[in-house]
């Protein structure tokens, strides 16, 4: 459970870290703050649009291998930030992270519930949510402070290093976890024909896009 909580921590810290570092990133890459905001909104668009199809595409994958792959992709994209020299190269790394994010949260809660001891599924889910909460109240502020002191790219690199350590921990402690899902991309048209689900997806997308739009420019305003 601790390993899964740490995984949630690094993903959520990375998700919101650009909010506090947006002015630094814009100045470093010679872009306006408003244009640099696409790093955040683009991330949100990718997660909103790709979560469902990618979850279906990977539905039959063994869960441990999939999670380790996602953490590996996440870490590599963060390490690559040290070498970005333009907005678009940075954007490419964030798209990679967003794709990993899209699948990560589709498997994390079910995986936590399965890995929890019998009768303690709620504890497993609480551990994952605890990682999310700690990321919001501690990880993002510390990452932002580190970015101001040592450089925004270095802050992302540290998150990548943390993700690599989590990967090694989960490789060691997490047992094999065969998929129990019967979904596939072929079921996507059927899902999209259900009005209730479409309404739920629409509300979720609008909520997340509104949240990211509001968060994006809090730092410059403050």
Regions found by a protein language model. Give the residues of each.
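Interfacial helix-cap and linker-helix signal at transmembrane-aqueous boundaries
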Residues: 25-26, 57-58, 112, 138, ...
């Amino acid at each position: 459970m601790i390993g899964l909580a740490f995984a949630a921590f690094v993903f959520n810290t990375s998700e919101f870290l650009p909010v506090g570092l947006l002015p630094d990133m814009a100045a470093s890459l010679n872009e306006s703050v408003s244009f640099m905001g696409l790093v955040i909104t683009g991330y949100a668009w990718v997660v909103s649009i790709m979560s469902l199809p990618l979850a279906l595409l990977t539905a039959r994958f063994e869960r441990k291998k999939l999670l380790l792959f996602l953490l590996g992709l996440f870490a590599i994209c963060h390490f690559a930030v040290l070498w970005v020299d333009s907005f678009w190269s940075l954007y490419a790394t964030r798209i990679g992270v967003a794709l990993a994010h899209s699948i990560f949260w589709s498997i994390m809660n079910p995986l936590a519930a399965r890995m929890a001891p019998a009768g303690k599924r709620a504890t497993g889910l609480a551990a994952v949510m605890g990682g999310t909460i700690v990321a919001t109240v501690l990880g993002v502020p510390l990452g932002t402070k580190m970015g101001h002191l040592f450089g925004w790219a270095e802050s992302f690199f540290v998150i990548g290093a943390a993700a690599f350590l989590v990967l090694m921990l989960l490789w060691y402690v997490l047992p094999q976890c065969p998929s129990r899902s019967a979904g596939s991309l072929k079921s996507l048209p059927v899902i999209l024909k259900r009005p209730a689900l479409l309404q739920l997806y629409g509300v979720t997308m609008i909520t997340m896009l509104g949240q990211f739009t509001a968060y994006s420019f809090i730092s410059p305003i403050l």
